[in-house]
Amino acid sequence: MKFELDTTQGRARRGRLIFERGTVETPAFMPVGTYGTVKGMTPEEVRATGADILLGNTFHLWLRPGEEIMRKHGDLHDFMNWQRPILTDSGGFQVFSLGDIRKITEEGVHFRSPINGEKIFLDPEKSMQIQDSLGSDVVMIFDECTPYPATEDEARKSMQMSLRWAQRSRDEFDRLENPNSLFGIIQGGVYEDLRDESLNGLVDIGFDGYAVGGLAVGEPKEDMHRILEHVCPKIPADKPRYLMGVGKPEDLVEGVRRGVDMFDCVMPTRNARNGHLFTSEGVIKIRNARHRDDTSPLDDKCDCYTCKNYSRAYLYHLDRCNEILGARLNTIHNLRYYQRLMEGLRGAIETGTLDAFVTEFYTSQGREVPEVPELTD
């Protein structure tokens, strides 16, 4: 992988990630394909929304279908017929989400399978081996996602263990002679000094990119912004910066303003299946009866397949009848909305008009533009 940085405005960055399987323009949003599929979508449909890269889930793909079946197909690209870049998370967040059915030790994590209750052990070495079998273009280190709330001492112990796991991930990745890219994950909770210690330790080990983890786990939005403002300018400028698991459209806008290059989140797809649709004027709840006889498209500014061909009334009808097509059309629209947002942000950085773009983004939804500190490096 090669990262090219074209231009900046304030801390916002316009660039690209170049892989053998294709180029990803940044800032970029990655749709989530947990089980090797973006729910309800074919790879061709996902690509048509403008997505250049997908996120796959190491933990779930390890449990089903497993490494053996994956290797029989070649890798995840061949298994799901997506021949563009794929980033896989390490499984750390999913283990974190298991709560009481897992036990974390220095060696790794013991837990029971959420599928059949089988006892399973996952450690940094195994995570690297699974991601190697997936053929991931970007491999994430195995870490512990520091929960919120956590005391500073709890966050320190968690972060320092993640650093030790980062070294083990690096060592196993190198032992496997994996030709792809490995990203480190910055932890430390809401504590700036711990974030600094984490980043410095990761830079000493050496990675191809750096993710900010342990955010969007329940902390106030102000804390997320504060941590991003603190840590992003300290990440080596020639490496991509990835904010994991974020988020709402406004989170992408605010992340880009603070120097983030990559995002992922289940929100556009999950919300689509629940009838919450993103538009240039805000969120539409298609289940609301006021859409029953509305012949207008979801968003007259949107160029997606759904908006070009179907009315709000039709989408309301599909939802009321619980038709699968409704969830699919909603997903196409929400994914395209996210990609159009990223296209707009990239264009605004290129032309030096990011402030105007951000103002239009908020005012078109009847919202005030949030105040931010002067963000310059």
Swiss-Prot record:
One of its GO terms (molecular function) is tRNA-guanosine(34) queuine transglycosylase activity. It comes from the Bacteria. The keyword Glycosyltransferase applies. Pathway: tRNA modification; tRNA-queuosine biosynthesis. Its EC number is 2.4.2.29. Its cofactor is Zn(2+). Keywords: Glycosyltransferase, Metal-binding, Queuosine biosynthesis, Transferase, tRNA processing, Zinc. Homodimer. Within each dimer, one monomer is responsible for RNA recognition and catalysis, while the other monomer binds to the replacement base PreQ1. Belongs to the queuine tRNA-ribosyltransferase family. Catalyzes the base-exchange of a guanine (G) residue with the queuine precursor 7-aminomethyl-7-deazaguanine (PreQ1) at position 34 (anticodon wobble position) in tRNAs with GU(N) anticodons (tRNA-Asp, -Asn, -His and -Tyr). Catalysis occurs through a double-displacement mechanism. The nucleophile active site attacks the C1' of nucleotide 34 to detach the guanine base from the RNA, forming a covalent enzyme-RNA intermediate. The proton acceptor active site deprotonates the incoming PreQ1, allowing a nucleophilic attack on the C1' of the ribose to form the product. This is Queuine tRNA-ribosyltransferase. It comes from Shewanella halifaxensis (strain HAW-EB4). The lineage of its organism: Bacteria, Pseudomonadati, Pseudomonadota, Gammaproteobacteria, Alteromonadales. The gene is tgt.
